[in-house]
Amino acid sequence: MIFSVIIPCYNCVKTLERTVESIRVCGLSDYEILLIDDGSNDGTAELCDRLCGKNEEIRCVHQSNKGVSAARNRGIDEARGEYIWFVDSDDTVDEDSLRGVLETALLKKPDMLLFGMSFDYYNHGKMYLRENLNPPSEGMLSLQNLKDDFDEFYNCNALTPVWNKLFRIDLLKKHGTRFREDMFLMEDYLFVLELLPFCKEIYSLRKPIYRYRQAEDERSAYRRLQRIENLAEYMQPFEQGLKTLGIPCEHVENLYSMLLKQRMYYASFSEIRSLVAQHNRGKYCRLKQPHPLKIYLCSRLVRIRHKLAVAVKSSSFFASSRARGFSSVS
């Protein structure tokens, strides 16, 4: 068997079947789909069983609710293929879109294969924007090649997720690379960082294959950030992973600054004051922050502008779709 597709499933009864069907027609052959039900309580578990019963290439595993990282790790343990691909339960791929990926994997046999993706933005259930992101280069890369162009790969989001990559399972198991189950933000990126030092050959495809559905609930990432008591301490595994790769410390600082900014985006004024005070006592205190009041006011202004931009883009997109004879885009 060549491919094991791992789909962690938690309360996704409305989207899972569409995701599974898109994989079944994406052009893969000699593959399995592993549905890891992570203690769902909305009918997802029963849907997993039905899909498994109807399709011989689908297997289903049930476990108590432990989180997406534990579900992915269970998938690694259960997988039978040469390559593993992690897919989220509300995302899709286009028909026949992975045929070229299949051919490349069979011919080149890289340790890791990465490809492009699109971010699909929705408003009231309808897509109003698709943003394609592709790796900066095409072809086989050595680890040193990737390190030399690390910023370019990072800035186009080619490195941070796992769902735009195929991984050799024997490499994961040989080096014991797992998802950190005590982390709930950017655990994908840490997984990639910890595996990269063992990848001798990496193949890059400049084609947007994976369709990532951006959550309409913009506060979901913020709620996960709220669970981090000390952001500087949370950064330590990323710092170690980047240090092992030989990536300059400025990258860690930029990552920290980005997460701190996101953490303060929806925060109250008192929360921002507390976060800035904690920052000023911490490891990254040399990265100067504006006055808490300025942060608070700027965040509110940006949120207002964002809501207006979404409303304008949505109405323009829907009007254009109607003019072309379509009521919506999915």
Question: What residue ranges belong to the model's regions?
Answer:
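Acidic helix N-cap motif at the loop->helix transition within catalytic regions
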Residues: 14-17, 42-50, 92, 96
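A conserved acidic beta->alpha catalytic loop
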Residues: 22, 37-46, 64
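Membrane-interface aromatic/basic loop that binds lipid-linked glycans or pyrophosphate carriers
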Residues: 240, 268-330
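Glycine-rich, basic loop-to-helix element that forms the pyrophosphate-binding segment
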Residues: 63-79
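Catalytic core of nucleotide-sugar-dependent glycosyltransferases
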Residues: 207-216, 221-253, 262-284
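Donor-binding/catalytic cores of nucleotide-activated saccharide
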Residues: 68, 89-202, 210-226
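Short aromatic/hydrophobic "clamp" motif used to bind/position activated sugar donors
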Residues: 84
